[in-house]
């Protein structure tokens, strides 16, 4: 029997599901329990296809627009995703007489309120974020047309020419890189000293915590694996943070079978984290894949302990989930385990 080479896996903590993702998944599960299938969900509830597929198997139907819901099903509930929606979406739901449950992350809702507060004070709103991301679309959709400008890069900040430089306020997308946002803000605040900040930090605690844990683990890592979907903003930012913080290479993966072990080169230290919408079962799957090839020692790279929770909608608080539902909500679904074994 061949002797396996030693390998240290630095496991970041915190990682994976945040309180907003937990809440959003729970809302869909509770709605299915209370109202029965189908429950419609506008956009992916969170950006992870395994979560989406698991909810589909339980009776959720995902649509991008409300007019995709058949008329014969418009008595069924519809859930708005964790990323938030423009004001026009609940207005359209009311026009269709739809019963809707808002799963917008409370921290995203807070950004919406901060943006509207700026507008009430007659400030033009600068939104730092990524064009096309559902959260950005939702935040911009809270404001009057022409009342918000999207700034994506330092170059955008350098060339921005507002009509009234003395009446500006900013908010940010919650899932941005802390460093990138700081660079953009530095430019904006130097150019526009009167720029009004939000009353509270826009980048969410989970984004900051996961980035800090990645920074702590990156130096000396031959490889840094981030579990997450390509359309997950916070997961892509973790890859960038790992690269900037000293990892020799950093890769975004959705499953263990995406890792090309034959081309990784010599490894002695691999660091591992997961975006806020990535289930823990995929982290377990990746560790198992490495154990088949290496003599693995796990080191925990923990920077903070998270204990945040968010309440679900009042209509759902009397519903009890099964142990299987709880396992799915916590990212440890037996259904996913079975898929892993079939790989």
Swiss-Prot record:
Dimethylallyl diphosphate binds at residues 47, 83, 133, 232-234, 277. It comes from Bartonella henselae (strain ATCC 49882 / DSM 28221 / CCUG 30454 / Houston 1) (Rochalimaea henselae). It is an enzyme of class 1 (oxidoreductase). The gene is ispH. Catalyzes the conversion of 1-hydroxy-2-methyl-2-(E)-butenyl 4-diphosphate (HMBPP) into a mixture of isopentenyl diphosphate (IPP) and dimethylallyl diphosphate (DMAPP). Acts in the terminal step of the DOXP/MEP pathway for isoprenoid precursor biosynthesis. This is 4-hydroxy-3-methylbut-2-enyl diphosphate reductase. The keyword Zinc does not apply. Signal peptide: none annotated. Its cofactor is [4Fe-4S] cluster. Disulfide bonds: none annotated. The active site is at 135 (proton donor). Isopentenyl diphosphate binds at residues 47, 83, 133, 232-234, 277.
